[in-house]
Amino acid sequence: MKYVLTLVALAFLVFSAQPSEAVEALHTYDSMKEDTQELASQYPEIAIYSEQGISTGLDLEIFSVDVALNITELSDEELHALPTMYVDGTHHGNEGMSAEASFLFLQDVLQRSAADPSYLEGKRLVVTPSVNPDGYVLDCRSNWNGVDLNRNYPYMWGMYGTSDTPNFCPVSGTYRGASEGSEIETQVNMEFMRNMNLYVYFSAHTGSNDIVLPWKITGEFAVPIADWELYEYFLNESANVSGLTYRDPGGAGESIAWGYGARAALSLIVEVDDMQWSPLVSTTIRGALSNELLMYDLAWENLELVGGHLQIIDETYNSVTLQNIGWGAAYNVTAGNEIVEKVERNQIITIPKNSNFLQYNRLIHEGEEADLTLISMNLTSIQNPENGDTPSIGFISASLTLLAIVTSRKRNDYNN
């Protein structure tokens, strides 16, 4: 019956479209895989196509593209250290436009980076168009086992908005799985994300046009988001460019709850379109996703600002002056003995320097590993000039200036 309805919808879209309108077909799983491989191959110096695992029922590859400047020359350690934005699609297999959004964003970043390498400098993008290949092929929300993969993640698993009964195609449901993280697709995605220095995680879905928070912050089961100042700032900036508003999620155990809760990344579902199962759009795919792609661009182009981001303004032998230019607060700031618990956005502070390193946390939420948000910066090695050691930068500068003045005066005396 569902496929009959699909044919009817196809006919309706084709015949109802105006002559000036394009009717564009969405990718299938096979064409998405082929086009993604081809896209990565066009940019061999900055992109690598890889396969992370195999789906539960049809043994289909869960494939990704990794993007970084001079990526083939980077060690695994260097690659994993880069601030990273991760984008995925089709946790729900019948939400084809979510895969399209992921693919188009990947395409945009590759094209811009090829034209201007600075667009990619110092950061990493990873894109997985389809987390649920079986559902993508079968046009089903659930995976082969009838599990809603976006209710299967360990963080807050089963708390609300889930079912304890499997749902097989064509029936859609919210079955959370037999246990948290029970599904192969979920496990593959989590393991993949653990190899990233995640700053931002966007999981694309369809069914509405808005942004979904990692967990409920209002009503029953509400839990505060520790880094809400950062979330609120980003969401306001996003609304300015995309017009998208935000809301609480409908269920627990979602991938973004795990992305923020376990991996300490700014994690959001982007509901890119209200269409779910139709294989066509009555406009261009890019046109339908234009506002959502602006939100992706915003996050990517400001990736290092997602959280606290301290900039050194001045440094002497015994102090360092810093400004937080990030979109969130910085925490536990120290250059030795003294610790400043919080530095607000745009705040300037001067702290004592008893070390050659500056350290701080760019988020207050830690995640499953204590050092996930830890930032370390090298400071200039300068000792106290009063002890006869290496003078400060300011002292050296003043000495050179004085020497220049004396030399100039002597020359003037000779000339006179």
Segments predicted by a language model, with ranges:
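Secretory targeting signatures
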Residues: 1-22, 377, 381-416
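Short glycine- and acidic-rich boundary segments immediately preceding or forming the N-terminal edge
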Residues: 19-63
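Loop/turn elements at helix/coil->beta-strand transitions in domains of secreted/extracellular proteins
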Residues: 44-47, 58-62, 81-84, 121-126, ...
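Short beta-strand-to-loop junctions in surface cap/lid or active-site-entrance loops
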Residues: 64-80, 90
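Active-site/substrate-binding loop(s) of hydrolase catalytic cores
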Residues: 79-91, 96-221, 271
